[in-house]
Regions:
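Conserved non-cysteine loop/helix-boundary elements of the Radical SAM core domain that shape
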Residues: 93-110, 130, 134-154, 165-283, ...
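Flexible loop residues that form catalytic
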Residues: 70, 85, 249, 320, ...
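Structured core elements
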Residues: 64-66, 79, 131, 220, ...
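Flexible inter-domain linker/hinge segments
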Residues: 33-60, 170-209, 213, 370, ...
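Gly/lys/ser-thr-rich phosphate-binding loops in alpha/beta enzymes
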Residues: 55-63, 67-83, 113, 289-307, ...
Length: 462
């Protein structure tokens, strides 16, 4: 209140002193302070107390939940880690998988507790982007898919009721399931639940979520290209999809055959077309190091962003890793395969970042697999940081959306510093327009809108 605490360092110094003065048994966490703060106080201090502020820099909180362990219909890819405790392509030790295991992969419990955790460390949770992870979700039982999504949305609606009670003066720890059930939404039977699992009808909970204090503003599904046909995409749309991530991995049929992928380049291109025709945002996973070296991999990425069959809105770069239990592990042990080293991966991804267009977002660099489970390949978990450091050393500004977001810039701007830019390009039988609000040097991005005109009519994706 006296304005003494202005930085995180000031806060830590004051917390240590207060713990000594009060002879507390444990060091107070920021979550402890937020729990005791009033609504008005939270408004002024949450920014200072917020842990990992970049998580909600855009104003949207990302909540990733994982579906139950299952088998991919085609079998297992050559490089895929073997695990009985997680869905395909995961080891069970990734952060999202650990949370999934903790809550026995129950969608409601995963979603509710992740929102609660984010709220407790000072993040806004009024807008949620839900990411449903776990191999090929559209290949699971149809009733399971509907139940899973409805339970995630129900968790958001219920946490919205929690926020209403907090506004009335209650503490988060005191709000029980019985108190949630007293809300008019349930007591007036607006949202019907069915015993014994609190089952809700998807359409009912979607409607309830539209007016909830915790709304789902984005929903992402992970899938393979051969499980991204029109019927699969229509089903995802009905569940609320706004983005689909497809595991493209490579653009060469001969590599698909080597890795026992079970689909073709044609499937990847068709999946991209169906998703765009449906007005969905498209993220592609690409895996450098799959029986290719740096020169060939760089050419692959150049093709992805110049060939109209690809040109994704978003990109995840996952260098190929060797894990025990995979067929790739046996090949590596026999000397028949050698993945990228840390330095080779950094060099390649730096070159990739140099050629990225301004309309793509780099979502992730490197898998979340713990280094202790990686037998060979990139073991440094901060690969992305190493790439960005190298770009800084070379004085290179990556043009992708992620690198130019204004929230990541240590600079103050005036509205007059920005103007509207327009860039048009073609992709999969459609005309794309990328409208962006940027500074005059095109180095800081304040906002953007994607618009596309396709053969099925006009769609707007933002």
């Amino acid at each position: 209140k006296n304005g003494k605490i202005k930085t995180r360092r000031d806060l830590e110094v004051e917390k240590r002193q207060l713990c000594r003065d009060l002879k507390l048994n444990k060091f107070m966490s920021n979550a402890d302070i937020l729990e005791t703060a009033t609504i008005e106080e939270k408004g002024s201090i949450s920014g200072l107390l917020r842990k990992k502020p970049s998580r909600t820099l855009s104003g949207v909180a990302v909540v990733a939940v994982m579906c139950h362990p299952h088998e991919c219909p085609h079998g297992r890819c050559f490089y895929c880690p073997k695990s009985d405790i997680a869905p395909p392509s995961y080891t069970g030790e990734e952060p999202a998988a650990l949370r999934g295991r903790m809550y026995e992969y129950h969608p409601y419990i995963q979603t509710f507790n992740r929102i609660k955790q984010l709220y407790s460390i000072g993040h806004p949770v009024d807008k949620i982007e839900l990411i449903i992870m776990g191999g090929t979700f559209p290949s699971t039982d149809l009733s399971y898919q509907t139940w899973f999504v409805s339970q995630c949305l129900k968790a958001m609606v219920d946490f919205g009721i929690v926020l209403k009670n907090i506004e009335k003066g209650m503490k988060l720890k005191d709000i029980t399931k019985d108190i949630i059930k007293e809300d008019p939404l349930y007591s007036n039977n607006i949202l019907k639940t069915f015993a014994p699992t609190d089952y809700v009808i998807l359409e009912d909970v979607q409607k309830a979520n539209e007016i909830s204090k915790v709304r789902c503003v984005g929903m992402t599904f992970e899938t393979r290209p051969d499980w991204c046909k029109k019927e699969h995409v229509d089903r995802m749309l009905n569940m609320g999809a706004t983005r689909v991530e497809i595991g493209v991995q490579t653009i060469h049929d001969e590599i698909y055959k080597k890795m026992k992928r079970g689909h073709s380049v044609k499937d990847s291109i068709e999946a991209n077309r169906v998703l765009r025709d449906s007005g969905l945002k498209v993220a592609m996973h690409l895996m450098p190091g799959l029986f290719q070296r740096q020169k060939e991999d760089l050419e692959m990425f150049k093709t992805v962003f110049t060939n109209d069959s690809y040109k994704p809105d978003m990109l995840k770069i996952y260098p190929c890793l060797v894990t025990k239990g995979s067929e790739l592990y046996d090949l590596w042990k026999d000397g028949g395969y050698e993945p990228y080293t840390d330095e080779e991966a950094v060099e390649l991804i730096v070159e990739i970042k140099k050629i990225l267009p301004k309309w793509v977002r780099t979502m992730r660099i490197q898998r979340d697999i713990p280094s202790t489970l990686i037998e060979a390949g990139v073991k440094k978990s901060n690969l992305g940081e190493l790439v960005y450091n190298r770009l800084d050393e070379e004085g290179i500004n990556c043009k992708c959306i992620r690198c130019r977001e204004i929230g990541h810039k240590d600079k103050n701007y005036d509205f007059e510093d920005f103007r509207l830019f327009e860039e048009s390009y073609t992709a999969v039988e459609g005309e794309e327009t990328f409208l962006s609000f940027e500074d005059n040097n095109e180095e800081s991005l304040a906002g953007f809108l994607r618009s596309e005109e396709r053969r099925v009519g006009k769609e707007c994706r933002s």
